[in-house]
Amino acid sequence: MHSISIVGRRYALALMEVAVDQNIVGQVMADFELIEQTMVEAKQLRLAIQSPLIQAYKKAALLKEVFGGKVSQQVATFLFLLASKNRAEYLPEVIQEYRALLDEQNGVISVDIKTAVDLDDKQTKQLKDKLEAYTSKKVRVHLATDKQLIGGLTIQIGDTVLDGSIRHQLAMLKNNLAAGALN
């Protein structure tokens, strides 16, 4: 695990423990989604939080100004703690790790699917249903289009990649021809 992920996971685990004790797991995730959305929309905020040149107390004040009254007291306190420990730049990783912990708790897995062409809603639902049957878990699908696949798709579930793309098939054919395995 990358050191950034280790820091993010450590803080996410601590917050999850508090959230479970106080029965606010869902509220914390809702607050994190608001924070995530705000940071996507407010580039200056994101840059300030990530900047090593801005002092920790200024980051704490900035987070309090932006999110005070908009998030639960527990999340506001957590943001202050993160900033005061000079760890505010890890906030995106903390959110990502918290979401992963929540998904794990709820039996949900994230699946990244790349296709050569856009899938319609019916195709996406069929694929999601098949993946849920295959994994015996609820699936959160993240779709992306990659024209370089030529055709077919790739599916990533955790560290496992299922590659059914034409690009992959052509690469395998090329390797087999080069190795003289084709008679």
Curated annotation (Swiss-Prot):
Its main location: membrane. It is a peripheral membrane protein. GO terms for molecular function: proton-transporting ATP synthase activity, rotational mechanism. It comes from the Bacteria. PROSITE patterns: ATPASE_DELTA. Gene3D superfamilies: N-terminal domain of the delta subunit of the F1F0-ATP synthase. F-type ATPases have 2 components, F(1) - the catalytic core - and F(0) - the membrane proton channel. F(1) has five subunits: alpha(3), beta(3), gamma(1), delta(1), epsilon(1). F(0) has three main subunits: a(1), b(2) and c(10-14). The alpha and beta chains form an alternating ring which encloses part of the gamma chain. F(1) is attached to F(0) by a central stalk formed by the gamma and epsilon chains, while a peripheral stalk is formed by the delta and b chains. Belongs to the ATPase delta chain family. F(1)F(0) ATP synthase produces ATP from ADP in the presence of a proton or sodium gradient. F-type ATPases consist of two structural domains, F(1) containing the extramembraneous catalytic core and F(0) containing the membrane proton channel, linked together by a central stalk and a peripheral stalk. During catalysis, ATP synthesis in the catalytic domain of F(1) is coupled via a rotary mechanism of the central stalk subunits to proton translocation. This protein is part of the stalk that links CF(0) to CF(1). It either transmits conformational changes from CF(0) to CF(1) or is implicated in proton conduction. This is ATP synthase subunit delta. It comes from Chloroherpeton thalassium (strain ATCC 35110 / GB-78).
